[in-house]
């Protein structure tokens, strides 16, 4: 699911390819504009970051570009999840209302299954993914919750320069370092076993060049690695689901989100006592202002300022509690103002859906379950 809900590596590769192809750097803003009001500095030319020349028009490999979805049409296909809530002041009933329709790619069998779990604290019902003992979007006697993708920029690609005298080493801020490697045997039914060697740098695992078209933007004598929050060996995201099912108040629900790592989500909450809230959950990488591609293209992995400096604290994530309007909604849209001090993403969802949702929500003084279905 985390791989389905992130596309920032695709965007980095696409921006780098455009930078190589365009004679006019300003053309990038026409073809891949930043979100209105983003205030992002102009990018350096991708080729200027490296001493070795890259082809201006590199041909993409013929093998499937996506390792898990070989028939995918290509990058840039946004999801369309929606979540919205209303307080009792804006509802015909005496309680708060919450609706959610999380969207993922079409698959067979289906990803989502409706289930009811009986806990010591009471029953919980909602959407589950087989194999995960939690309700990811649903309700208990005390609380309802839903999710939309936050589009958090949780991936960075890094160009790792190989030691020309020893290809088992790569360049770091402190000199050459050995790749961390292991060998795995893949058993093939009806065929011969396949042995692969995996390699890691300090930034993350090394990716095969045919994946995500990264070979087209990898300089000669280099490989590409990936830093991604979902690869954390301390991923406690499942704890958020377990805590939500036992939560009894808005405060309990917000606190549960602190355990979440990836994929980043906007958690929408509505409580039995009529309160509503929304919090972005998921670890947000801490990047330096001196990052030479601003996380919009692959960066040089041996430059210390390009590397992640850890993760921001949970309380810094965008949060909205009991708005005066009595209405909350999210359609993967931008959730922070331009002066928000941290980098969340360069690629928010579209504005059409949130505009329509806002219009529909404000068209009524009070809402019902039926109006939410509309």
Question: Where are the regions a protein language model picked out?
Answer:
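Substrate-recognition/specificity elements adjacent to catalytic centers across diverse enzyme folds
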Residues: 1-97, 102, 108, 126, ...
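Short helix/loop capping segments that flank catalytic or ligand/cofactor-binding pockets
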Residues: 13-15, 94-95, 106-110, 115, ...
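Ordered core of a single globular domain
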Residues: 20, 34-38, 56, 233-234, ...
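Short beta-strand scaffold segments in enzyme catalytic cores
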Residues: 83-87, 133-137, 265-270, 275-277
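Short active-site loop/helix that positions an aromatic residue
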Residues: 104-117, 159, 238, 247, ...
């Amino acid at each position: 699911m985390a791989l389905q809900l992130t596309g920032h590596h695709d965007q980095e590769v696409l921006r780098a390819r455009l930078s190589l192809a365009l004679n006019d750097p300003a053309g990038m803003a026409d073809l891949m504009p930043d979100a209105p009001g983003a205030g992002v500095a102009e990018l350096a030319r991708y080729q200027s970051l490296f001493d070795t020349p890259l082809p201006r028009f590199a041909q993409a490999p013929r093998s499937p570009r996506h390792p898990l979805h070989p028939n995918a049409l290509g990058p840039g296909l946004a999801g369309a999840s929606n979540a919205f809530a209303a307080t009792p002041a804006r509802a015909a009933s005496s309680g708060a209302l919450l609706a959610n329709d999380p969207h993922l790619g079409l698959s067979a069998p289906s990803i989502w299954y409706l289930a009811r779990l009986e806990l010591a604290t009471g029953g919980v019902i909602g959407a589950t993914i087989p194999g995960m003992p939690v309700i990811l979007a649903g309700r208990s006697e005390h609380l309802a919750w839903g999710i939309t993708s936050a589009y958090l920029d949780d991936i960075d690609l890094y160009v790792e320069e190989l030691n020309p005298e020893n290809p088992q080493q790569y360049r770091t801020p402190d000199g050459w370092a050995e790749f961390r490697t292991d060998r795995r045997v893949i058993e093939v039914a009806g065929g011969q076993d396949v042995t692969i060697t995996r390699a890691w740098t300090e930034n993350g695992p090394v990716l095969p060049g045919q994946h995500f078209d990264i070979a087209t933007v990898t300089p000669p004598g280099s490989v590409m690695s990936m830093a991604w929050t979902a690869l954390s060996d301390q991923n406690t995201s499942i704890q958020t689901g377990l805590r939500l099912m036992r939560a009894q108040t808005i405060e309990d629900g917000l606190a549960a989100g602190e355990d979440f790592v990836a994929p980043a989500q906007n958690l929408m909450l509505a409580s039995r006592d009529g309160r509503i809230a929304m919090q972005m959950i998921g670890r947000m990488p801490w990047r330096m202002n001196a990052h030479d591609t601003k996380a919009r293209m692959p960066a040089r992995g041996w430059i210390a300022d390009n590397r992640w400096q850890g993760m921001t604290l949970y309380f810094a994530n965008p949060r909205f509690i009991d708005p005066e309007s009595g209405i909350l909604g999210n359609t993967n849209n931008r959730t922070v103002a331009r002066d928000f001090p941290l980098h969340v993403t360069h690629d928010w969802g579209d504005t059409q859906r949130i505009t329509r949702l806002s219009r529909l929500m404000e068209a009524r003084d009070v809402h019902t379950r039926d109006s939410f279905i509309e």
